A protein has these predicted regions:
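Glycine-rich oxoanion-binding loops at beta->alpha junctions
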Residues: 36-94, 134-148
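Accessory alpha-helical/coil subdomains and C-terminal extensions
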Residues: 85, 96-98, 104-108, 115-116, ...
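A glycine- and small-aliphatic-rich helix-loop capping segment at beta-alpha/alpha-beta transitions
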Residues: 8-17, 41-46, 108-118, 134-138
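Short, ordered loop/turn segments at secondary-structure junctions
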Residues: 27-32, 62-63, 99-102, 114, ...
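Short glycine/serine/threonine-rich phosphate/pyrophosphate-binding segments
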Residues: 1-10, 34-35, 79-80, 93-107, ...
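Residues at the starts of beta-strands that form the adenosine-phosphate
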Residues: 21-24, 92, 115
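N-terminal phosphate-binding or glycine-rich loops at protein starts, especially the Walker A/P-loop
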Residues: 1-38
Length: 187
């Protein structure tokens, strides 16, 4: 799947290039974890068995880019908190996976002097500079498999089913899911 496969690939690459002495710190729930200092020391065995597992072993959260410079209800300046925790953890680099907002925040942190490697991850496949994002094709594959199964049930029972999939306004994912199995039957 998308996130776990990418996390595993990053970890395996680090271990292969730098040896098992490399320290990998997983940040729980993405930027929220970096803001509030919620982390987990990772070991090589943490990355075994996750290649085909959906979701993410580290969790995720929504931290809207437009609110990154807004002090929250606990008087926390999110950008300053992330910079402080980055330094406190002694990170050499922050690897982030995500869509447009994640990429904007990664660039903001880079502008603040942090070393950031940003990887494109969104089922919408709408990020500038890349043809395919992590997660797009796996999401399409899963949705089209479900559509195939439901189609056979609808046909055998003489019924019509409406299938809704998650996507952003550009809807590349929706179009791809609907087009592949039955190009004349998608709206």
């Amino acid at each position: 799947q998308g996130l776990n496969a990418t996390i595993r690939a990053v970890a395996k690459t680090l271990y292969n290039q730098l040896g098992n002495d490399v320290e990998i710190i997983g940040i729980i729930d993405g930027y929220r974890g970096l803001i509030y200092g919620e982390t987990r020391k990772m070991k090589p065995e943490n990355f075994s068995g996750i290649l085909t597992m959906g979701g993410t072993i580290l969790g995720t959260s929504r931290q809207p880019f437009k609110l990154m410079r807004v002090v929250d209800e606990n008087s926390v300046d999110k950008v300053e908190a992330m910079k402080k925790n980055y330094k406190k953890l002694g990170l050499d680099c922050l690897v982030v996976l995500g869509g447009n907002g994640t990429q904007k925040t990664a660039n903001l942190l880079r502008e603040e002097g942090l070393n950031v490697v940003s990887l494109p991850k969104t089922i919408d496949n709408d990020l500038w500079g890349t043809d395919k994002t992590f997660g797009f094709q796996s999401a399409v594959d899963i949705a089209t498999n479900v559509i195939d199964c439901i189609h056979s049930t609808a046909t055998s029972h003489g019924r019509v089913f409406i299938i809704e999939v998650m996507a952003h306004t550009l809807c590349r994912y929706c179009r791809r899911c609907g087009y592949y199995p039955y190009p004349r039957n998608s709206v």
